[in-house]
Amino acid sequence: MLVLGLETSCDETGVALYDSERGLLADALFSQIDLHRAYGGVVPELASRDHVKRMLPLIRQTLAEADCVATDIDAIAYTAGPGLVGALLVGASCAQALAFAWDIPALGVHHMEGHLLAPMLEENPPQFPFVALLVSGGHTQLVRVDGIGQYELLGETLDDAAGEAFDKTAKMMGMQYPGGPEISKAAMQGVAGRFVFPRPMTDRPGLEFSFSGLKTSALNTWQQCRNAGDDSEQTRCDIALAFQQAVVETLTIKCKRALKQTGLKSLVIAGGVSANKALRASLESMLGDLRGHVYYARPEFCTDNGAMIAFAGCQRLQVGQKEDLSISVQARWPMEQLSGL
C-alpha cells in the first residue's frame, strides 16, 4: 500500500510517500521558522496561509522524488489533530479533496501518534511494549504503549510543556525563535554550577510534570543579573545551561520511575525536544545502567514531518480503517481515545 502523508498541525508543511513493502520513498518539508521569527512565536493565521501556498508544490515535489504519479497512490493520511485548527483544516481539506478526485480512502491521523511511531522508521525499531516520552512544544507525556492504538497515559505536564518552557525561557532572555535550539546552543558555552534551578515535582511520588515554576526561576535569575548590571552573553549561557540541566534531569528521573513502575526496559522518546543532545545522552546513560534500550527518530523526524503521518496512517489503513469525506479536525485530542488495531 502506497500512502501519501500530509502534516500541517502547526508551522511545518510536511509531505511524504510511504510504501508498506518498500518503506519511505520520499519526503519534503517546508519550515515556517523564518516567517514567524519576527513575531517571537507562531502566528496561526500566517501559518494557515503559508500551508495553502506550500502544499501542492510539495506534493508534486514528493511524487517526482519517488518517481510516482497520482494513480499510484492507494490512500492519503493527514494530521487531524491536535494542533492549530486553521492549519489542520488546510491539510484535511487538501487530503479529502484529493481522495475524492482520485477515488481513494483518506484517514485523519493523531499528530502525537505520528511522533510516537516515528522511531519505527529507523533500521532498529522498538518492539512493543515500551514506555514513550512524548516531549514537544505542546506536550510532555509518559505513555505505556502495548501496540498501535493501545496507549495508557502514565503522567503528563500540569502546566507548560517542556518545549514550551524552552521557548518561553529563551524569549525572556532575548533569544530568537524557536527557543529550544537556541537554549541548547547557548548551554554548550555555559559554566556548570554557577546557577542551579529546581527539579520540579521530583521530590514527590508520581509521574506528573510541571515546568512553569522552573521557567519563572530562570526569569527571576535573569532579571536579578540584569538589575545588577550583568546581562552578558556568558551569563545568558550559564542560565541556559542550568535551565537545560534542570529539564533534562527532571525528564530522566520521571522516565526512570515510569520504567520501574511498568517493569519495562525499552524507552521511546519522540517529539521536537527528543532531538536535544543532552536529553538523549542522559536517557542513554540511565537506560545503560538499567540494561535497557532507548529509541528515537533521526533528527529531521523529531520535529513535525509528513513521513511519520504517512507511516502511522499506513498502519491503520492496512487494516481497513477509513473515514467518509467529511472534514473534521480537533485542536485537542486525547491519545487514549484512539482505537487499537
UniProtKB/Swiss-Prot annotation:
Cofactor binding notes: Binds 1 Fe(2+) ion per subunit.
SUPFAM superfamilies: Actin-like ATPase domain
Enzyme Commission code(s) on record: 2.3.1.234
Keywords carried by this UniProt record: Acyltransferase, Cytoplasm, Iron, Metal-binding, Transferase, tRNA processing
Residues involved in Fe cation binding: 111, 115, 304
Cofactor: Fe(2+)
Function: Required for the formation of a threonylcarbamoyl group on adenosine at position 37 (t(6)A37) in tRNAs that read codons beginning with adenine. Is involved in the transfer of the threonylcarbamoyl moiety of threonylcarbamoyl-AMP (TC-AMP) to the N6 group of A37, together with TsaE and TsaB. TsaD likely plays a direct catalytic role in this reaction.
Protein name, UniProt field: tRNA N6-adenosine threonylcarbamoyltransferase
Species this chain originates from: Pseudomonas syringae pv. syringae (strain B728a)
Lineage: Bacteria, Pseudomonadati, Pseudomonadota, Gammaproteobacteria, Pseudomonadales
Gene name in the database record: tsaD
